[in-house]
Swiss-Prot record:
Site (Increases basicity of active site His): 88
Cofactor dependency: Mg(2+)
Site (Transition state stabilizer): 74
Cross-referenced InterPro entries: Aldolase/citrate-lyase_domain, HpcH-HpaI_aldolase, KDR_aldolase, Pyrv/PenolPyrv_kinase-like_dom, Pyrv_kinase-like_dom_sf
Protein name: 2-keto-3-deoxy-L-rhamnonate aldolase
Transmembrane segment boundaries: none
Residues bound to Mg(2+): 153, 179
Active site, renumbered: 49
PANTHER family reported for this sequence: 2-KETO-3-DEOXY-L-RHAMNONATE ALDOLASE
SUPFAM superfamilies from the UniProt entry: Phosphoenolpyruvate/pyruvate domain (SSF51621)
UniProt keywords, alphabetically: Lyase, Magnesium, Metal-binding
Cofactor note: Binds 1 Mg(2+) ion per subunit.
Molecular-function GO term, any one: 2-keto-3-deoxy-L-rhamnonate aldolase activity
Length: 267
């Protein structure tokens, strides 16, 4: 089988295209396929905070596959064993949370690459990613088409950002606003002026280093700010949040507003 692996999301980052995404936290292939028909450039399947098993991730990758939206998987953490499983089920773009140091970044890079470039375990004959051994020269193609994104979301990570940006094999850095604002002493307040200043500066530093800069903004105004600051892959919503907002909005048409939650939501 002479199929060539491609990664349109990674190619878009290389070209500097702006790519708009959506967070998937509902854990179902049905919802993933609905989102995939909506036209988002990328869909983040969340395995960190949503209760997704590896098999759940697998089914959502299958559901998204026929459509143009590109899947990005965020595993619960960046261990070598878990990364191996997620790549074998067909993920080509990973977002690794809580990367605080350059050494952590190097370990993640190694876990995602086959030897001699890294330490990814070899098992193409049983992997969906290799079409069960039917893709010729799969290991070399996999190394080339992989897109690796890491999350900077703590004071420690901010201090080490320049070193993280120097790590070969990192394609982009994603700023985690919820954890970052909490780490900076502003829990549940990513809109605080000091947090905003730091986010803007980080985006500039990431792009200046030649890497892609990413962000999740459930507030459209914040999303527009990040795009203006130079972020080039931005998630503009979370499926579960959009669902609850729509449910509350519809109920408010028929019941008094006091009986419906009107609190402003943040991720």
């Amino acid at each position: 089988m002479n199929a060539l692996l491609s990664n349109p999301f990674k190619e878009g980052l290389r070209k500097g295209d702006t790519q708009i995404g959506l967070w998937l936290s509902s854990t179902t292939s049905y919802m993933a396929e609905i989102a995939a028909t909506s036209g988002y450039d990328w869909l983040l399947i969340d395995g960190e905070h949503a209760p997704n098993t590896v098999q759940d991730l697998y089914h959502q990758l299958q559901a998204i596959a026929p459509y143009a939206s590109q899947p990005v998987i965020r595993p619960i953490e960046g261990s070598k064993a878990l990364i191996k499983q997620v790549l074998d089920i067909g993920a080509q773009t990973l977002l690794i949370p809580m990367v605080d140091t350059a050494e952590q970044a190097r370990q993640v890079v190694s876990a995602t690459r086959y030897p001699p470039l890294g330490q990814r375990g070899v098992g193409a004959s049983v992997a969906r990613a290799a079409r069960w051994g039917r893709i010729d020269n799969y290991m070399a193609q996999a190394n080339e088409s992989l897109c690796l994104l890491v999350q900077v979301e703590s004071k420690v990570a901010l201090e080490n950002l320049d070193a993280i940006l120097e790590v070969e094999g990192i394609d982009g850095v994603f700023i985690g606003p919820a954890d970052l604002s909490a780490s900076l002493g502003y829990p549940d307040n990513a809109g605080h002026p000091e947090v905003q200043r730091i986010i803007e500066a980080c985006i500039y530093r990431i792009r200046a280093a030649g890497k892609a800069a990413g962000f999740l903004a459930v507030d459209p105004t914040m999303a527009q700010k990040c795009l203006a600051w130079g972020a080039n892959f931005v998630a503009v919503g979370v499926d579960t949040m959009l669902y609850t907002e729509a449910l509350d909005s519809r109920l408010a048409m028929f019941k008094s507003v006091q009986s419906v939650s009107t609190a402003k939501r943040s991720y």
